[in-house]
């Protein structure tokens, strides 16, 4: 299955609550390949915002988002978008110009985290261990494996593991036949066999870590992330105390050096052969669905979903 970016000319606006202490525009859906995930995330968020006593207007974002925001004049924008135009720094940039406080990270940190090769370079520059990777363009016309197998193919700018493929030694795969479905460039990353860990960070503080145990599929792809029964979450992650602490410290380091804001989720692999920790990415707009990791770790840390949303709202600001 392919998930593509779609151009949507007009935003859809729906008033969810007419009274409250402040007016929040909950922006979700949008035009990215992660549209459906964003809409599912927004369902719980809108309930929490209403429970917290806010006046809430829901906006399914289209190209006229600036016009709609100018019309409704919210006090705060809750950025519940995933993927292109929301998670890549576009919406934060617009909100900076409009001087509307918003949740989640700003322009630079969002753009850096969303682009896999730039985030990898950032990790390297800040002495954060990360997997070897290269960029391959469609124009290169490569006919052989661009890296020794096993390796991972990742779209340069997609989230939710959309378009991610792992090419193992035994796979019947010819790179010459790869059709670059998500843009003219991909990241080719060395596959690291090991245990996968996720860390939730809120306002510069790591809340905890969990381990992903695969039940179905060979790697943590889109289907595995969002289908119940495909993966098991072990929370807290069953690790020796010093290694668990290192996970939290490394996550906070990534968050702070990238100048993130609000919630984020850092992803790591503990290599089976060397017991070495590798940072894979940081997600500045983590999911808020029933199967999402940040709310699960927050609950383990004693923060229920409504209080998590309240804490995120407190961080709303724009960059001047």
Swiss-Prot record:
Location of the protein in the cell: Cytoplasm
**Which GO molecular-function terms appear in the entry?**
ATP binding; D-alanine-D-alanine ligase activity; metal ion binding
Q: Which reaction does it catalyse?
A: 2 D-alanine + ATP = D-alanyl-D-alanine + ADP + phosphate + H(+)
Q: Which Pfam families match?
A: Dala_Dala_lig_C, Dala_Dala_lig_N
Q: Where is the ATP-grasp domain?
A: 120-314
Name the EC number(s): 6.3.2.4
Q: Main localisation, per the record? A: cytoplasm
InterPro entries on file: ATP-grasp, ATP_grasp_subdomain_1, D-Ala_lig_Van_CS, D_ala_D_ala, Dala_Dala_lig_C, Dala_Dala_lig_N, PreATP-grasp_dom_sf
Gene Ontology biological-process annotations: cell wall organization; peptidoglycan biosynthetic process; regulation of cell shape
Q: Which cofactors does it use?
A: Mg(2+); Mn(2+)
Q: In which pathway does it act?
A: Cell wall biogenesis; peptidoglycan biosynthesis
Q: Where does Mg(2+) 2 bind?
A: 281, 283
Described by its record, this protein's role is as follows:
Cell wall formation.
This chain's protein is named: D-alanine--D-alanine ligase
Which species does the entry assign this protein to? Rickettsia akari (strain Hartford)
Gene from which the chain derives:
ddl
């Amino acid at each position: 299955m392919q998930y593509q970016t779609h151009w949507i000319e007009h935003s859809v606006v729906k008033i969810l609550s007419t009274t409250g202490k402040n007016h929040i525009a909950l922006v979700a859906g949008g035009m990215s390949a992660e549209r459906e995930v964003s809409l599912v995330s927004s369902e719980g968020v809108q309930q929490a915002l209403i429970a917290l006593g806010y006046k809430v207007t829901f906006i399914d974002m289209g190209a006229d988002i600036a016009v709609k925001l100018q019309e409704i004049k919210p006090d705060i924008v809750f950025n519940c978008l995933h993927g292109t135009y929301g998670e890549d720094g576009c919406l934060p940039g617009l909100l900076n110009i409009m001087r509307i406080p918003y949740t989640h990270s700003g322009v630079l940190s969002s753009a850096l985290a969303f682009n896999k090769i730039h985030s990898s370079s950032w990790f390297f520059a800040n002495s954060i261990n990360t997997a070897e990777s290269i960029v391959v363009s469609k124009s290169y016309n490569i006919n052989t494996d661009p890296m020794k197998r096993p390796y991972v193919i990742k779209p340069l700018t997609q989230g939710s593991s959309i378009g991610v493929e792992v090419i193992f030694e035994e796979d019947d795969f010819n790179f010459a036949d790869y059709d670059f479905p998500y843009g003219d460039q991909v990241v080719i990353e060395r596959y690291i066999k090991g245990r996968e860990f996720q860390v939730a960070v809120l306002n510069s503080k790591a809340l905890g870590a969990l381990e992903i145990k695969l039940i179905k599929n060979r790697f943590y792809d889109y289907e595995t992330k969002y289908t119940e029964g495909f993966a098991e979450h072990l929370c807290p992650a069953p690790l020796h105390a010093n290694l668990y602490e290192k996970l939290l410290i490394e996550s906070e380091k990534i968050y702070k050096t990238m100048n993130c804001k609000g919630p984020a989720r850092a992803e790591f692999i503990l290599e089976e052969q060397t017991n070495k920790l590798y940072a894979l990415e940081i997600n500045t707009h983590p999911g808020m669905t029933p199967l999402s990791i940040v709310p699960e770790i927050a609950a383990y840390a004693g923060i229920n979903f409504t209080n998590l949303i309240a804490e995120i709202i407190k961080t709303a600001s724009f960059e001047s």
